């Protein structure tokens, strides 16, 4: 992180990009409603405040990394997740996440929710809209994927803004280029998601090394500015 984060900040500054960072309070696997509060907030504040200082925003990813799904979801061997015991347990976890964000970043408005691994059940989606007015935007997947919550760019009937992410990672292959170009043509929109641990995962480019991955991101941002100079940075 001592190299990756300063480089990411430099990319944002050089290309006038404002990041959205989303919070996971912990990586505990409990889905029965048991809450273990995160007491060490130093790293959250360190990275979060730098992101805010650069003009970015903070949002929500999860109390833990367990998607908001009940026992009627069967991930099989596809995803290594558990389901929640009941809706009350899901609600308790999201409530804790929001309290954690408020306590860690007092006075900072957060409205974006990014589902863990892009998985969000119908029950979880309904609960967010009904019980958590703080969440005004959901950012999941534009393209289909197994168990993925797939979105169009729209305002849903319940008022939540559906704002899918189009591409992700630092392996800028032909498929990603086609997807990005298609969305510029259709909606004149671009959105991109990157995990801090992409550079540790071979499937997401670790074998390339960070310098190559960083170069890919810089080239992509250059292309975006050249191809769509009037695109607003929101």
Name the predicted role of every residue range.
Residues 4-6, 39-49, 144-151, 169-181:
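Alpha-helical scaffolding within the catalytic cores
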Residues 138, 180-191:
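Aromatic-lined glycan-binding groove of carbohydrate-active enzymes
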Residues 14-123, 187, 192-200, 204:
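Metal-dependent polysaccharide deacetylase catalytic core of the NodB/CE4 family, i.e.
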Residues 1:
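Active-site-adjacent substrate/metal-binding segments within catalytic domains
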Residues 6, 10, 95, 99, ...:
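Solvent-exposed, polar/charged alpha-helical surfaces in well-ordered, non-transmembrane soluble domains
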Residues 35, 119-162:
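Substrate-binding cleft/loops of secretory-pathway carbohydrate-active enzymes
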Residues 13-23, 102-105, 132-153, 194-234:
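C-terminal domain-boundary segment and adjacent tail
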Residues 160-161, 166-174, 190:
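Catalytic-face loop-and-helix region of soluble metabolic enzyme cores
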